[in-house]
């Protein structure tokens, strides 16, 4: 053992890392989510981890803390990499991608993108510096049918339902409802109200009222009406009637209610309570122009959104002189997964993907053991051969420790049959490697 | 269309990005490689993209150019992230991982890791700043059976054989053969010779001879013997006899030849020429101590290694006071893939994963179309519904452009049958969504 200095490795705050059993569950989740996206025909896209800073900052000053890259051994006068930063979401890279590869794409372009993103935030509960997002977006030239505003929540519903996670609700709203309602009230800066209402679940109604009156300049009647609108919730088109009862009218409001009603209508076959219209959902981002989405855990809404998205009129406008409206939604995989791990709700899958451990009877019988393993692999079983001749008990112990369900015994003497032991039941039976079915 | 300034997006040199058809092939490759690794029971591991710099630099000054991270909006006096860098390979993070999670692992620990790595090199042919590596390693406490030195090339052989790539050879050597041979010749600094011989394929025999004599201080007889050894190649144990004929003897040489012979012997069932002992293979890295691997394309060996690896005695020694020998090999996915793309040998798969496009006969029949699509998805077919009522020709054209093989026609009138059109054959037949099989 060398006497060199030991660097005791420790976790890096905000950069999650899983032991193999936990990782095997994460991998199952990733496969499941991808399959859900592909089932609806979405194409896989990956973009580099970096973008030039101009692209990352193209939506104006961003509140996301960007990590920039610097070469450790860069020459003092070398500034060639000075303008690269790690992407902080997958939406900006996707907009850049669509503009850059416009002529190679078929529209409406439906893409999914499952990648890590980075934010130089102060790590705290549910906030990571490196985390995986699972995004789907549909983008089209000039016009994007409202049908997609309903398809995306349906996909998310199917995907999340297949994961073993606590109950959640996908809340839907429409920016036009908010904007039209506020304009119908005579409010001149609806976006300021949207930003204030977006904080409702964090800071409460009284604090929002204060902002609306003191900062956005609303009358107390206007503020009261805005908060009344935000209280409307429901999983069917009765929410449309509830808004109408507030007595505000404006063409944008009418358009928004029509859209919201149509989306709810197309989703009416989903289990009640899974997708709910919630007129308090605003999404702070400026670029949403219609439908907005936000999902939260029912038992911990304060944890914040686990999925979010919406419709935008022209996300790639800063990269290409084409009108490219779209609608997208993002599943915050790491946010969901890490919470369940830390709460002990995910305790892990199998340590390894091995289905069968083939016992090595002796060094002389290694090639026979390897041949059985090859045969089982050929037939679709993930198979290991124990790595050295050792007591059978020790070999079985290895399978137990690694969560391997079956131990295979090739003949220890010529002419004897193969046997296989099911470690869960303890049962051991004769078996033929050419026909055994697990 | 807004009049805002347009940021024309351009590729970032050294950061590959693929259009959807190319990406679909890459995804197939990634799935195939992963399946190959899992078939042999390797556990999935992912580590964060970053390590603290102390860890990245723990093997001493590295020739790999490291990218460090800096927060764009960092306060002048905030140095909390100053010590983070993107990993430049997956070996150092794996060594750190094993040390950090030692008590949660089962040994021998077999892990695969498929992730992006970053190097701040000057981009050139076959050299990227961001690329994907596919690594497998087996690591054990105190002792690692030689059997694994043969298992890894077998896995790589199976995996690469399943990809449609030009002919390649996986070359094997053993550091002990080189070291023992050099010591048997009376050379005092075998590592200097190993580093020189490692350049043989790049700079040629004469240049290596010059280095050996002028810089490593060898006599011309010693240099000649070293170069003679490097010429020995063969896919079976006859290479062992060929070395013996050179008349050098040393216990380390004998041990190395025994190991090399045993590994070749265990691999003797593989197709001739796929795994070859090549005594010129040295691998420059200091930490290899036995078997070394390096695969190259037969028609373009100058492109450099497409897989590489070897056996190491104590890779995690700087992180933990345990002896953890291992053996590993890495497939340079991006190096292989990007070369074939740039040479036009990979022209792309399907634009999207959709198997069936369901035609939308009219807005009134949307829910019937959605129901057929749901039924087909349930049965495992990736299915899209055309997004708006449009001329049938236009809907079929969309399927053609997106490489969707089947177009489904739900009844346009009540009581009529479903029909499905195979776009490859043009054949259109009646079909039942509950039993149709593609």
Swiss-Prot record, chains A, B:
Keyword terms: Aminoacyl-tRNA synthetase, ATP-binding, Cytoplasm, Ligase, Nucleotide-binding, Protein biosynthesis
Record-linked Pfam families: HGTP_anticodon, tRNA-synt_His
One GO MF term attached to the UniProt entry: histidine-tRNA ligase activity
Subcellular location: Cytoplasm
GO biological process: histidyl-tRNA aminoacylation
UniProt entry tagged with the keyword Electron transport: no
Enzyme Commission identifier(s): 6.1.1.21
Main localization, broad class: cytoplasm
CC terms in the record's Gene Ontology section: cytoplasm
Domain of life: Bacteria
Gene3D superfamilies found in the cross-reference section: Anticodon-binding domain, Bira Bifunctional Protein, Domain 2
PROSITE patterns documented for this protein: AA_TRNA_LIGASE_II
Leader sequence segment: none
SUPFAM superfamilies per record: Class II aaRS ABD-related, Class II aaRS and biotin synthetases
Record-annotated disulphide pairs: none
NCBIfam families the UniProt entry points to: hisS (TIGR00442)
Oligomeric and partner information: Homodimer.
Classification via PANTHER family: HISTIDINE--TRNA LIGASE, HISTIDYL-TRNA SYNTHETASE
Name of the protein this chain belongs to: Histidine--tRNA ligase
Gene symbol of the encoding locus: hisS
């Amino acid at each position: 053992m060398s006497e060199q200095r030991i660097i005791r490795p420790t976790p890096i705050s905000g950069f999650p890392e899983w032991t193999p059993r936990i990782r095997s569950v994460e991998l199952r989740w990733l496969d499941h989510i991808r399959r859900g996206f592909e089932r609806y025909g979405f194409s896989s896209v990956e973009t580099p981890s970096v973008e030039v800073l101009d692209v990352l900052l193209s939506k104006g000053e961003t509140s996301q803390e960007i990590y920039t890259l610097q070469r450790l051994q860069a020459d003092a006068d070398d500034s060639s990499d000075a303008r690269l930063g790690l992407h902080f979401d997958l939406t900006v890279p996707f907009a850049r991608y669509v503009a850059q590869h416009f002529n190679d794409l078929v529209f409406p372009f439906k893409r999914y993108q499952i990648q890590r993103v980075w934010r130089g935030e102060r790590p705290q509960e549910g906030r990571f510096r490196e985390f995986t997002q699972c995004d789907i977006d549909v983008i089209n030239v000039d016009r994007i049918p409202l049908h997609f505003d309903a398809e995306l929540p349906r996909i998310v519903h199917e995907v999340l339902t297949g994961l073993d996670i606590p109950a959640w609700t996908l809340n839907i709203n429409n920016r036009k409802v908010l904007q039209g309602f506020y304009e119908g009230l005579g409010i001149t800066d609806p976006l300021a109200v949207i930003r204030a209402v977006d904080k409702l679940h964090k800071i409460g109604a009284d604090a929002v009222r204060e902002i609306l009156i003191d900062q956005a300049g609303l009358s107390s009647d206007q503020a009261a009406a805005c908060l009344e609108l935000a209280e409307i919730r429901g999983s069917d088109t009765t929410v449309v009637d509830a808004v109408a009862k507030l007595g505000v009218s404006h063409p944008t409001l009418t358009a928004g209610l029509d859209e919201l009603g149509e989306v709810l209508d197309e989703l009416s076959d989903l289990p009640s309570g899974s997708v709910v219209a919630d007129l308090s959902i605003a999404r702070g981002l400026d670029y949403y122009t219609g439908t907005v989405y936000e999902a939260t855990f029912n038992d911990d809404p304060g944890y914040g959104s686990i999925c979010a998205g919406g419709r935008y009129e022209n996300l790639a406008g800063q990269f290409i002189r084409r009108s490219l409206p779209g609608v997208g939604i993002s599943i915050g995989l790491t946010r969901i997964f890490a919470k369940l791990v830390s709460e002990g709700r995910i305790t892990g899958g199998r340590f390894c993907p091995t289905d069968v451990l083939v016992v090595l009877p002796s060094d002389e019988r290694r090639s026979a053991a390897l041949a059985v393993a090859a045969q089982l692999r050929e037939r679709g079983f993930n198979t290991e051969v124990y790595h050295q001749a050792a007591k059978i008990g020790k070999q079985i112990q290895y399978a137990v420790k690694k969560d391997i369900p079956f131990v295979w015994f090739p003949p220890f003497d010529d002419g004897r049959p193969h046997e296989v032991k099911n470690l869960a039941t303890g049962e051991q039976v004769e078996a033929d490697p050419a026909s055994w079915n697990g």
